[in-house]
From Swiss-Prot:
Claim: Cell division is one of the keywords in the record: yes
Compositionally biased residues, Low complexity: 12-51, 1109-1118
Gene3D superfamilies associated with the record: 6.10.30.50, Formin, FH2 domain, Formin, FH3 diaphanous domain, Leucine-rich Repeat Variant
Protein name listed in UniProt: Formin BNI1
Protein task: Required for the assembly of F-actin structures, such as actin cables and stress fibers. Nucleates actin filaments. Binds to the barbed end of the actin filament and acts as a leaky capper, slowing both polymerization and depolymerization. Protects the growing actin fiber from tight capping proteins and so increases the time of elongation and the total amount of F-actin. May organize microtubules by mediating spindle positioning and movement in the budding process. Required for the maintenance of polarized hyphal growth.
Domain of life: Eukaryota
GO CC entries: cell septum; cellular bud neck; cellular bud neck contractile ring; cellular bud tip; hyphal tip; incipient cellular bud site; mating projection tip; mitotic actomyosin contractile ring
Lineage, opening ranks: Eukaryota, Fungi, Dikarya, Ascomycota, Saccharomycotina
InterPro entries in alphabetical order: Actin_filament_regulator, ARM-like, ARM-type_fold, DAD_dom, FH2_Formin, FH2_Formin_sf, FH3_dom, GBD/FH3_dom
């Protein structure tokens, strides 16, 4: 503003400076002259120039002559410099002192005229200058009536103000010498003030000064060069403000050039250096300011016309300069409508397809179209026209008044230049050609708009242009012999032109060429008839070619054609460059938008200041530090988890290796089968076959590979996980077995002979020895075979699922075979089959001896395997000797004995089966035998880790083994058989197949057994599992089986019992143990008559009082008026609506005999009217008139609307804050993204609503004629005027419809940018609250103690089946459901009591979890989703700007600045989104971990959202029961205190009154005072059927207190004189509750007894005094027992009520009475003791 105020100048600056009347006043006062104000202003200005001696010769020279301008405005015609006599002395009107110092201080002095008439005239001129006609007439009259002195004072003050203004202006003009001006112009660093001073100096300085500037300093050339430099600077700089200094400099330079040319010495310069002038001035024809264009137009007109008759060079130079403006960039207001803002944009050079003069005339036409709707008004005018005089110091009123005139002057100057250009053509052909070019450029349209201005001078110029055109056409007709009437040619009719040409070339040699040219033209255009764009392009090329040929002045036609073709090619190449430039413009415009956004962001940061920006950065750093710390914590946790996973991975590998080794052992045990023992040639051959050799070999390879992988993984993962002890031992043992097997393979068996055996053989006979040997061998073999048969028979009955072998014979699978024994058996069999040394021994005893030695070795190995829990029992049913095949080595007697033993074993097996079937008992396979196999099978086959089969204890007898038999030397050692019998697993008895389930157990048992087992279910969980195990459908194979299964299945569990009813209040709080509390009694009735001492009935309440007299008196006139029509007519009506007085009117029929009969209304109304009362009432009691809804104006009613009514109403409601703006202004505010639009959330939300942005087909069809397509390169005007639409429709059209291709993305982006910071703060706050809650729960020191107490007490209460290691949080809500035996206390009450009394430190958990209360109002899942949606929205906006709807700026509305608002904030928003996502992920991870820590499922959304609320609900319930417990304990404490207080004086009284022999009885009575009293009160209580009113109870209590007070008035020293008072106060102030809540059972019984006494008294009609003697009724022997009991009950009942209802004063009074009663009781005791 300061620069604008300082640097703005225009053509009228001097005249405006002296436009006030003070100059004329000064002139008239001093010279009595009638000079104009303008000349006086110049005189005063010239007198000031003496103060600057640098550019002056002497003062007399300046006084003798000066320069003046006849028309100060440069727009006025005939503006020229001339010498005039000033006719004024410098020293007379204004006293000045010469000084060489600048600035100069001068004194102001104005001489007063002697004539009063002169002062009067000067004063009237002053009033005219002040526009006194706008003042009120009264003020004007007062000013005219001022005295002469006051008028002169006002004149002098105005003159002094004008003088000071001139002085300030003179000081602002830094006048330099010509050389100094030349120096600053050459340096191109001249300021606006200096250029303005140069322009003033060229007008006011003497001719010598101007000559020095022009000839000596080449000032005109410097000005032209500087003007060119300014034009280049405008293009290079991104100037958007029309009021920039650079435009002021351009105006000042053109004004200076015009001043130079206005003098002859300057005008002569254009003859020599016209090129510099023309090129500089022609560029100003495209200036955004009208004043600049007008000056440039006048200058060019002068250059062509000045002595141009003999110099056509300047004329052609001007034409070439006009042709070159198409190649120059320009600045203009970039908006397709008339309500664009004051924002400039740089336009690139126009393409070569623009016609000659087209760009220049387009600028003129645009200026005319931008004028206002009304004459001399800027309403509807564009900023281009409004800013025509930007930089001037004229007043706004002056500029507005001259706006239309200066636009007309610009049009006149333009039309004059056109006429000069056309008129200076060499001949009529050139002139006709120039006119054709002007018409092609749009001159006809401009002339039509010029005529609409209605200016006479402009109309004359247009008429002159048309006359010259007609003259040239006539000359053309004359020269071409077209002047005959038959050959009249119309140059605007193409058909007439072609006919004329055809007539001229017909029957000549040119006929063929003409016809061929027309035919080719027709054929060329006929092919492109369907494509108007191509047709236009081809015709343009053809016209350009013909035009270039016709414009070339040369004799050679070939040269003309070549020149035309070259120009055409140049133009076409320029078109390609232009298209490429357009693509570049899109890119650079985007870059410019981003740069502008960055600049604005930097400006915003700078505006924040150092402190603000540092604080912002510190906040960002804190947030990042917090996120980094959390990531570090997560990283540490992940490292720990990774280490754990590595360890777990290695342990799983070890487990897998262990399982494979165990599986290999089982396979090896199960594969040994003695398939055949053949006797061949006295040799024994044992063949052992396996069915899983390949699987075993593969397992061995896998074991070795796993061991190698294990070592490799340890090295790669950097872990050192040692194998388990079992795996290590198994590895070592298997290695030992392999080594020993290799040793056995390499052993050379030799003949072995025992010395003792040899001796026995020598002593005995050969027959006996042979018999003994055979017998011993038979017995040993039979024993071995019997043991093996028994084992095989037992193992056959064990149901073991087979291994899934894809092929091969079906075989049983065993998992507890004797690993080492079977393995070595296999090795021995292989050795025996392969060794020739063994096969040569035919002696059975020798074979058995070798076998015995091997088995002894196996025994040693088995002892080493005892610590590894390996069962060496043989379970293969096929692993037995085939005695038929071994017949060659066994005697017949042994075979027979073996068969007998086998038959006996078969009988025993059948007997055992029958017994087992009768007992219906089962025994499942041994867990040790099944554990390894089932674990492997469940893991790799069934997909399970562990399946535990129930263990059922069977009482069936087991098969007894044989005793060890004595053997000979050749038999096996009995120790081996003993050990073998102990180690081989004994099979269970065989069960009936129909009675087995899938686990090998019975399907069911008898109902008795089931019931018996149900009884013992709490002691054995395994039995429950067996009874409730599901039965597979695959096991039911027959109807019988199915029936038995159905009938004998375990019954389903009984349904759960219904939930218990809500617990009643405990007795101490007024609850009842037997039933619910009775409803509260009705309110008490009024006291009966006999208690009031009168038999009269209480009178009813009096009626409402009548209205006040004051109100009635005020309502007199209106009432009478309404009752009488004539009186109503006489009362004047108010001018505006008043507040209504609401009263109860008296009917007209009741007025006759009433107070209101014949009131004196007429006189009173007249009196009130005369006194102004009614007027005052209108001011005081004016009613607020309801605002009328804004009705549509007449022009709005005539407008069109297409929107639905509800949509239009939404526009009106949401945009009501912008009703003061017009439609165009509001649309521009939205497009410019003004702050008041962006800060209004209702507007942004409304713009983004789906029903607003979704355009239906009907709306699209209706709005299409009014729409503007901004997606095309050239924006065309709509078919219909959008002003015909109503306001909502117009806004909808301009925003939602015209911008529908990117409106949704635009609105979404603005919403994100505006709200991202606020949303971020909100989400971070919620996340941090969640973090605090999670940390408080996780780090709580006392919460775990509370839960452990609950768990311990609960486990103590539950039976063994419901024992728990922990409980879920949902169980906390059930703690208050379980109540005690009397329903007076819940489990939570007891837990709180235990914690408060035994573990008070645990109560701190409430404070530790206090921060959880804030989280309960939030949904955890919604917060997480909101954070993700926040980041997703910002990402979508970035995508829209990169590759989406917001990526192409060329498709935006020209005034849209959405990127300028979005781009600066987007990087920060992206950073915020990343930080928010990181914090949300961390928070959710911690929250999920906490849920897992408490055994909850984090994937369940309902559980997740209610997780924190479970803690808060528990705390609320805990606080509630804590308050209830404390309240109950306080009541009990008060009760105990009162009880002790009552018992103490009673014991002393009883000791005084009773004899010594009754001491025992009195002591007993002292201990049972309360009990006896309660018994008596119960006996006096009414029956259940009797109902007593609470009102009666209260009344009786009151009467009892009154009677006691009367009775105890005389005996103050009695112990009972205090209790009634205390009771009275308790009744009156405290005990007003009729319900039983909070009262004890003793209180209720006392109430019942009182009610019974009241009924008795009412029936007997006794006086109140009888009722008061409560002691006589209750206990005649002890008169104070009833009063004491009553007082006790009152105090108990009022203990908790008084705290809430009594005031401080009443509470203090009650405490004082209590102390008094205690003191009185103590005094009584002391008296009694003294009397004794």
């Amino acid at each position: 503003m300061r620069r604008r105020h300082k640097d703005k100048h225009n053509t009228d600056s001097v005249s405006d400076m002296s436009s006030n009347d003070s100059a004329s006043i000064l002139s008239s006062a001093s010279q009595n002259s009638t000079h104009s104000r303008r000349s006086a202003s110049l005189q005063s200005l010239h007198s000031q120039s003496h103060q600057y001696p640098q550019g002056h010769n002497n003062s007399s020279h300046r006084q003798a002559s000066t320069y003046s301008i006849s028309s100060l405005s440069p727009y006025d015609k005939g503006a020229s410099l001339s010498r005039k006599s000033t006719n004024i002395s410098i020293s007379r009107p204004i006293k000045t002192n010469d000084s060489n110092v600048f600035p100069i201080k001068q004194s102001f002095q104005l001489e007063r005229p002697n004539s009063a008439f002169e002062i009067e005239r000067m004063f009237r001129e002053l009033l005219e200058k002040l526009n006194f006609k706008s003042l009120p007439p009264q003020a004007t009259r007062e000013m005219l009536n001022y005295d002469i002195d006051r008028k002169w004072m006002m004149i002098e003050q105005d003159a002094r103000a004008e003088y000071d203004r001139q002085q300030r202006y003179a000081r602002a003009q830094n006048i330099f010498s010509p050389e100094e001006y030349a120096k600053v112009l050459m340096s191109k660093q001249v300021s606006t003030n200096q250029l303005s001073g140069l322009w003033l100096a060229l007008r006011s300085e003497p001719i010598d000064w101007v000559r020095r500037f022009v000839y000596d300093c080449q000032g005109d050339t410097l000005l032209s060069v500087y003007l060119t430099k300014l034009q280049q600077e405008m293009v290079s700089c991104n100037i958007t403000d029309i009021e920039d200094d650079i435009f002021d400099k351009e105006v000042n330079v053109l004004q200076s050039l015009k001043c130079l040319m206005n003098q002859r010495l300057g005008a002569e310069r254009i003859k020599t250096d016209v090129d510099v002038f023309v090129n500089a001035v022609s560029g100003s024809l495209l200036s955004p300011r009208i004043i600049t264009r007008k000056l440039a137009t006048d200058t060019l007109t002068f250059m062509i016309s000045y002595n141009g008759n003999n110099d056509n060079g300047r004329y052609h130079k001007v034409l070439r300069a006009l042709d070159s403006i198409n190649e120059k960039s320009r600045m203009e207001f970039d908006s397709p409508d008339n309500y664009s803002p004051r924002k400039l944009t740089r336009k690139p050079p126009q393409p070569a397809n623009f016609k000659r003069f087209e760009l220049w005339l387009n600028v003129v036409e645009k200026t005319i179209d931008a004028r206002g709707k009304f004459r001399n008004s800027d309403v509807g005018a564009s900023d281009e026209l409004k800013s025509a005089y930007a930089g001037t110091r004229g007043s706004v009123i002056t500029t507005r008044n001259q706006l239309e005139n200066h636009l007309v002057e610009y049009c006149i100057a333009t039309m004059l230049l056109i006429n000069v250009i056309v008129g200076n053509g060499t001949d009529y052909r050139v002139r006709i050609h120039l006119r054709a070019q002007f018409r092609a450029a749009g001159l006809d349209r401009i002339i039509h708009k010029f005529l609409e201005l209605g200016n006479e001078e402009l109309d004359n110029m247009i008429t002159r242009h048309k006359i010259d055109a007609n003259n040239d056409e006539e000359e053309l007709k004359y020269s071409a012999n077209f002047n005959n009437e038959d050959n009249e040619v119309d140059f605007n009719d193409p058909v007439n032109l072609v006919q004329s040409l055809w007539q001229s070339v017909k029957n000549s040699d040119a006929e063929g060429y003409f016809l061929s040219a027309i035919q080719h033209l027709f054929l060329n255009q006929s092919e492109k008839r369907g494509n108007p764009e191509e047709m236009n392009r081809s015709l343009r090329v053809l016209d350009g070619l013909i035009q270039n040929i016709s414009s070339v002045r040369t004799v050679s036609e070939d040269t003309a054609i070549n020149v035309a073709i070259n120009k055409l090619i140049s133009n076409m190449s320029t078109d390609d460059m232009y298209r490429k430039a357009l693509e570049d413009v899109k890119i650079y415009r985007r870059i410019a938008e981003e740069a502008t956004a960055e600049r604005d962001d930097m400006s915003r940061q700078l505006s924040m200041g150092a402190d603000g920006y540092i604080n912002s950065l510190l906040n960002d750093v804190k947030e990042r530090d917090m996120v980094i710390s959390r990531f570090r914590r997560i990283n540490e946790d992940m490292k720990e988890e990774l280490e754990q996973m590595k360890t777990k991975y290695m342990q799983e590998k070890q487990e897998s290796e262990l399982e494979m080794r165990e599986l290999l052992i089982m396979l090896n045990n199960s594969e040994i089968g003695a398939n055949a023992v053949k006797k061949d040639g006295g040799k024994t051959t044992i063949s052992i076959s396996t069915s899983n050799e390949e699987l075993a070999a593969r397992l061995k390879k896998q074991i070795h590979r796993r061991r190698a992988e294990y070592k490799l993984d340890n090295r790669q993962l950097g872990t050192n996980v040692e194998p388990s002890s079992r795996l290590r031992a198994l590895r070592d043992q298997m290695g030992d077995i392999e080594n020993m097997a290799r040793e056995l393979e390499m052993t050379d068996f030799e003949t072995y002979a025992d010395p003792e055996e040899e001796e026995n053989n020598n002593d005995q006979s050969p027959e006996k020895s042979e018999i003994d040997e055979s017998r011993s061998s038979q017995e040993s073999e039979a024993e071995i075979q019997s043991v093996e048969e028994d084992e095989e028979e037992e193992e056959k009955e064990v149901v073991i699922p087979p291994l899934p072998v894809p092929s091969g014979p079906k075989r049983a699978v065993r998992n507890d075979d004797l690993v080492r024994l079977d393995h070595l058996r296999k090795k021995l069999a292989n050795l025996q089959s392969e060794s020739n040394d063994i096969m040569k021994y035919n002696s059975s005893s020798m074979f058995n001896k070798q076998k015995f030695l091997a088995m002894e070795r196996l025994q040693e190995l088995e002892n080493n395997f005892k610590d590894f829990n390996i069962d060496f029992a043989v379970s293969d049913p096929e692993d037995k000797y085939n005695f038929n095949s071994n017949a060659g080595s066994v005697d017949d007697s042994i075979k027979n004995k073996t068969k007998e033993v086998l038959a006996e074993a078969e009988q025993i097996r059948e007997e055992l089966r029958r017994q087992l079937a009768a007992a219906q008992k089962i025994k499942s396979p041994s867990p040790k035998r099944n554990t390894v196999l089932e674990r492997i099978e469940n893991k790799y086959v069934k997909g399970q880790v562990k399946i535990d089969a129930p263990d059922v204890v069977s009482n069936s007898p087991r098969t007894q083994k044989r005793a060890h038999r004595s053997t000979t030397l050749n038999a096996m050692d009995p120790k081996f058989l003993q050990e073998l019998s102990l180690k081989v697993g004994k099979a269970e008895p065989i069960q009936d197949a129909n009675n087995k389930n899938q686990f090998g157990g019975p399907l069911s048992s008898s109902p008795e057994d089931v019931s018996q087992k149900h009884k013992t279910s709490g002691d054995s969980s395994d039995k429950d599992k067996v009874l409730s195990s599901p039965i597979s459908s695959n096991d039911i194979k027959s109807p019988e089986t199915g029936n038995s299964t159905t009938s004998s299945a375990a019954p389903p569990p009984p349904p759960p019992p219904p939930p218990p009813p809500p617990p009643p209040l405990p007795p101490i709080l007024g609850g009842n143990n037997s039933s619910a509390a009775p409803p509260p009694p009705p309110p008490p009735p009024p006291p009966p008559a006999f208690l009031n001492g009168s038999g009269s009935v209480i009178p009813p309440a009096p009626p409402l009082p009548p209205p006040s007299s004051g109100r009635s008196s005020r309502s007199v006139p209106s009432t009478v008026t309404k009752s009488s029509g004539s009186a109503f007519d006489k009362i004047p009506r108010p001018k505006k609506k008043l507040k209504q007085l609401h009263w109860e009117k008296i009917d007209h029929s009741q007025v006759g005999n009433s107070f209101w009969n014949d009131p004196n209304t007429h006189t009173l109304v007249d009196d009130l009217m005369s006194k102004g009362i009614f007027d005052e009432i209108e001011l005081i009691f004016a009613a607020k008139e309801a605002k009328k809804l804004a009705t549509k104006k007449k022009e709005d009613l005539d407008k069109v609307t297409f929107l639905a009514r509800d949509i239009s109403q939404q526009f009106s409601i949401n945009l009501h804050a912008f009703n003061s703006f017009s439609d165009e202004e509001f649309v521009l505010k939205v497009l410019r993204c003004d702050k008041d639009v962006l800060t209004n959330p209702a507007v942004l939300d409304f713009f983004g609503k789906e029903d607003i942005v979704e355009i239906t087909n009907t709306l699209a069809r209706n709005f299409e004629p009014y729409s503007t397509d901004y997606k095309t390169e050239e924006i065309t005007k709509p078919e219909k005027d959008p002003n015909e639409l109503q306001r909502p429709d117009r806004i909808y059209l301009e925003l939602m419809y015209n911008l529908q291709h990117y409106w949704k993305s635009r609105t979404r982006a603005l919403n994100v940018v505006v709200n991202y910071d606020k949303d971020y703060v909100e989400y971070v706050k919620k996340l941090r609250l969640i973090d605090e809650a999670v940390d408080s729960i996780k780090n709580s020191k006392h919460l775990k103690g509370v839960f452990e107490i609950i768990l311990a007490v609960g486990n103590y209460m539950n039976d063994s089946a419901k024992q728990a290691h922990g409980f879920k949080l949902s169980s906390l809500q059930r703690l208050s459901f379980m109540k005690d035996e009397k329903n007076s206390m819940t489990f939570l009450h007891y837990v709180e009591k235990v914690i408060r009394t035994q573990y008070p430190e645990f109560l701190e958990f409430i404070n530790e979890l206090s921060c959880c209360n804030e989280i309960t109002k939030f949904s955890i899942e919604n917060i997480n989703n909101d954070c993700k949606e926040y980041a997703r929205a910002i990402k979508n906006v970035q995508s829209s700007i990169d590759i989406g709807n917001l990526s192409d700026v060329s498709k935006f509305h020209p005034s849209d600045r959405v990127l300028k608002a979005v781009l600066p904030a987007l990087p920060r928003a992206k950073r915020k989104a990343e930080l928010l996502l990181d914090q949300a992920n961390y928070t959710m991870k911690e929250f999920d971990d906490l849920m897992k820590y408490f055994g909850e499922d984090p994937t369940d959304q309902f559980v997740k959202n209610s997780f924190i609320s479970k803690f808060t609900d528990f705390m609320k319930d805990f606080k509630r029961v804590q308050a209830e417990n404390i309240k109950r304990e306080e009541e009990l404490r008060v009760y105990e205190q009162r009880k002790k207080l009552l018992e103490k004086p009673k014991s002393s009284n009883n000791g005084d009154s009773n004899a010594s022999d009754q001491d025992g009885e009195s002591n007993e009575g002292d201990g049972g005072v309360m009990d006896s009293l309660l018994q008596r009160l119960k006996a006096a209580a009414p029956t259940k059927g009797e109902s007593a009113s609470a009102r009666k109870k209260a009344l009786m209590r009151k009467q009892i207190l009154e009677s006691q007070r009367k009775r105890t008035t005389g005996s103050v020293g009695s112990p009972t004189n205090v209790s009634p008072t205390r009771n009275n106060e308790s009744d009156s102030g405290v005990d007003n509750k009729d319900d039983t809540h909070g009262s004890s059972p003793l209180d209720e019984q006392f109430h019942d007894s009182i009610t019974t006494q009241e009924d008795r008294i009412r029936d007997d009609n006794r006086p109140p005094e009888g009722v008061a003697d409560f002691s006589n009724v209750e206990d005649p022997e002890n008169p104070d027992v009833g009063a004491r009991a009553k007082n006790l009950l009152q105090e108990l009942r009022g203990a908790d009520e008084s705290s809430s209802k009594l005031s401080d004063a009443q509470r203090y009074r009650q405490e004082r009475l209590k102390k008094k009663s205690v003191q009185i009781d103590l005094d009584e005791v002391a008296k009694n003791n003294n009397s004794e």
